[in-house]
From Swiss-Prot:
This is Increased recombination centers protein 15. Present with 6400 molecules/cell in log phase SD medium. It comes from Saccharomyces cerevisiae (strain ATCC 204508 / S288c). InterPro entries: Class-I_Pyr_Nuc-Dis_Oxidored (IPR050151), FAD/NAD-bd_sf (IPR036188), FAD/NAD-binding_dom (IPR023753), FAD/NAD-linked_Rdtase_dimer_sf (IPR016156), Pyr_nuc-diS_OxRdtase (IPR001100), Pyr_nucl-diS_OxRdtase_dimer (IPR004099). Pfam families: Pyr_redox_2 (PF07992), Pyr_redox_dim (PF02852).
Length: 499
């Protein structure tokens, strides 16, 4: 015997043969397993976490959005004078972090059980354990307290997600120096909380602890926060957060972080512009400088692969590795933004590529919608003004303040900020009037962005949007008005405001 036959001859514990094996059960892995099973394929899924749902559910989007909302309510309730102007009388608010974490843990378990029930209902076999390649079609699964066994699969979907990037000189101990994952499970509120990294994850966690009373400082090595954001939006976001009490140290690198005998963290910082170093003090430092594909433990080197193959050598039409077309990486292990919606769309594409029917194609993920869930929320989709200028695409823009919107003025009281007013900006192609980008600041940006994303991904024109009746009064009317302004190249089209 030789090759694969030789390997198989040493496999004493051979468990099962599947059409599809999915490694990882976050949003992408779950979607792939469901799609495959519903297409009539014998499917199994393996995940090493105690609860299904991946980092997205356990220590990512779900915990962060939950704590953002709860901390925002607390911040709002503290502003008694602002609320009493609307007629509501309140007792002083108090926030119990331990109770919040207990409720969050219960919520995560319940959502994990939803994943489990749906997979069971669709006859997907679930293994709780680790997975490692033995050869291109065989994977060893190790479950706690059990002898490892081998699973064979015709197709293998790799959806193992991502892990935080470590920083040289700043060792994460998850005590004083923590990851973003650990930050979302803290059961206390640090007095001085410093965050290394001004991306979306860092900013959202900054908002949580700032709302709860921590003195928050963000250290960012670049000259601006959120590098993929429209410049106007990024500048407005920074100003809004500064007005809420968050401090920013831009063009600044963390060189070293050490705790003294009293437990205080002493962080050596280097300003890239002045070239000067100085020491910053805090109680907790969170490292949030990005994430990288999580492939450790899969033993991909045993089949001649490395991390670059998952990023560079993938047929994006079928989500297939060029070397092994039956191995299909999806989600955070692939090139592009690390978003759940990207993972889900890639999962659908991967399963459809093996000849399965299902939903009619996948969405256009070239410009995925993005939301920063601070208060107010920041949302954007499509081209930025800088991107259009770089691509030499002629464009027109329309910008509308939400303060001019009837519905906006009937909603919850909000902190007044004389520097930045919530707005929506629409960018359209001057040649064919296609909607190229939409950028907004609003408490409900996550919901409003859906219609903007539809317009951008479907290639709708400004004329298409203007033909659609919008409910009144509604926040969405501001989107239509911004489109009309863009058509008129920023001059008022005399929009009639209904009473």
């Amino acid at each position: 015997m030789g090759g694969e036959d030789e390997i198989l001859s040493t496999m004493e514990d051979f468990a099962a043969v599947y059409d599809v094996l999915v490694i990882g059960c976050g949003p992408g892995g779950f979607t792939a397993a469901m799609q495959a099973s519903q297409a009539g394929l014998l499917t199994a899924c393996v995940d090493q976490r105690a609860s299904l749902g991946g980092a997205y559910l356990v220590d990512g989007a779900v915990p962060s959005k939950t704590l953002l909302y709860e901390s925002y309510l607390y911040r709002l309730l503290q502003q008694q004078e602002l609320i009493e102007q609307r007629g509501t009388r309140l007792f002083p608010a108090k926030f119990d972090m331990q109770a919040a974490q207990s409720a969050l843990k219960h919520n995560i378990e319940e959502l994990g059980n939803v994943y489990k029930r749906e997979l069971s209902k669709n006859n997907v076999t679930v293994y709780k354990g680790t997975a490692a390649f033995k050869d291109p079609h065989h994977v060893e699964i190790a479950q706690r307290g059990m002898k490892p066994f081998i699973v064979e699969a015709k197709y293998i979907v790799v959806a193992t997600g991502s892990a935080v990037i470590q920083c040289p000189g700043v060792a994460i101990d998850n005590d004083k120096i923590i990851s973003s994952d650990k930050a979302l499970s803290l059961d206390y509120i640090p007095s001085r909380f410093t965050i290394m990294g001004g991306g979306t994850i860092g900013l959202e966690i900054a908002c949580i602890f700032n709302n709860l009373g921590s003195r928050v400082t963000i250290v960012e090595s670049q000259s601006e926060i959120c590098q993929n954001m429209d410049n106007e939006l990024a500048s407005a976001t920074k100003t809004l957060l500064q007005c809420q009490g968050i401090a920013f140290l831009l063009d600044t690198r963390v060189q070293l972080a050490e705790a003294d005998a009293a437990g205080q963290l002493n962080i050596t910082l280097l300003n890239k512009v002045s070239k000067k170093t100085y020491v910053h003090h805090c109680d907790v430092l969170m490292v949030s400088i990005g994430r990288r594909p999580l492939l450790k433990g899969l033993d991909i080197s045993s089949i001649g692969l490395d991390e670059r193959d998952f990023v560079e050598n993938v047929d994006v039409q079928t989500q297939s590795l060029l070397k092994y077309p039956h191995i299909k990486p999806i989600g955070d292990v692939t090139l592009g933004p690390m978003l759940a919606l990207k993972a889900e769309e890639q999962a659908i594409r991967a399963i459809q590529s093996i000849g399965c029917t299902g939903s009619d194609g996948t969405s256009n993920c070239g410009f995925p919608p993005n939301v920063l869930y601070c208060q107010p929320q920041i949302g954007w989709v499509g081209y930025t003004e800088e991107g259009l200028a770089k691509a030499r695409i002629p464009y027109q823009k329309g910008r509308v303040l939400f303060s001019q919107n009837v519905r906006y003025n009937t909603l919850l009281p909000r902190e007044e900020n004389t520097t930045v007013s919530p707005f929506i900006k629409v960018l359209i192609d001057s040649r064919d009037m296609k909607i190229l980008g939409v950028h907004m600041i609003n408490d409900d940006a996550n919901e409003l962005l859906s219609q903007a994303s539809m317009a951008v991904s479907l290639g709708l024109t400004a004329h298409d949007v203007c033909k659609v009746p919008f409910p009144h009064p509604s926040l969405s009317e501001s989107f239509k008005q911004a489109v009309q302004l863009a058509m008129a190249n920023g001059t008022s089209p005399g929009v009639h405001v209904r009473e």
